[in-house]
């Protein structure tokens, strides 16, 4: 989340009116005003990239800068409800020991894009015996300190690939995504916690006996 100020009253008024509008609001990306509108890195990048959310824009951006707890004042839906409304999610992790967001996505049968700098991405690769692809339900992209542009291109290509798929292909990918999520249930992972606690307790006992 960013340094959120308050919900946009001009946006709220339009939503409540139920009317159709053909003129954009000021700063037509963001749902809530920020305390630092002129210094927010996301907004700065959108402006730098020439994003406008105009009628002719092929890409429309909706920047929700707050926690999705169901009480944000504009959408008033939870994060999980929002995930369900997606066809594909993108979490291009730079570093996450595990990374729950792509796992949560596939648990809702929504395919995800992540990287091998997330533990989840590495784990999915281990399931597949190599880099997981979009058809598997999770696309894992190689990311390092030096390949930002390559990662951006890979994300772009994957989104374009997904958008060209037939409904039958998407259904299969969604099923594969859910199958991956099933393998991450606690009933499968809990044994590793038992093993870790066992090792820790044995080592603690050795230290006590050596005193």
Give the label of every model feature segment.
Residues 1-211:
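Catalytic cores of carbohydrate-active enzymes across secretory and cytosolic contexts
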């Amino acid at each position: 989340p960013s340094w959120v100020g308050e919900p946009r009253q001009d946006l709220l008024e339009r939503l409540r009116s139920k009317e159709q509008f053909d003129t954009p609001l000021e700063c037509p990306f963001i749902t809530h005003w920020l305390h630092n509108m002129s210094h927010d890195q996301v907004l700065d990048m959108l402006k730098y990239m020439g994003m406008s959310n105009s009628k002719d824009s092929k890409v429309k951006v909706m920047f929700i800068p707050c926690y999705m707890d169901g009480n944000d004042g504009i959408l008033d839906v939870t994060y999980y409800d929002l995930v369900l409304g997606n066809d594909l999610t993108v979490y291009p992790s730079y570093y996450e020991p595990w990374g729950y967001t792509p796992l949560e996505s596939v648990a809702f049968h929504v395919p995800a894009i992540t990287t091998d700098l997330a533990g989840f991405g590495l784990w999915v690769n281990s399931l597949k015996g190599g880099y997981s692809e979009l058809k598997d339900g999770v696309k894992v992209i190689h990311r390092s300190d030096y390949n930002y542009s390559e990662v951006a291109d890979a994300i772009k290509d994957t989104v374009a690939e997904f958008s060209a798929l037939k409904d039958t292909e998407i259904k299969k990918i969604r099923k594969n995504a859910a199958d991956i999520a099933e393998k991450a249930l606690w009933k499968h992972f809990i044994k590793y916690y038992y093993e870790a606690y066992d090792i820790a307790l044995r080592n603690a006992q050795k230290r006590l006996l050596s005193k």
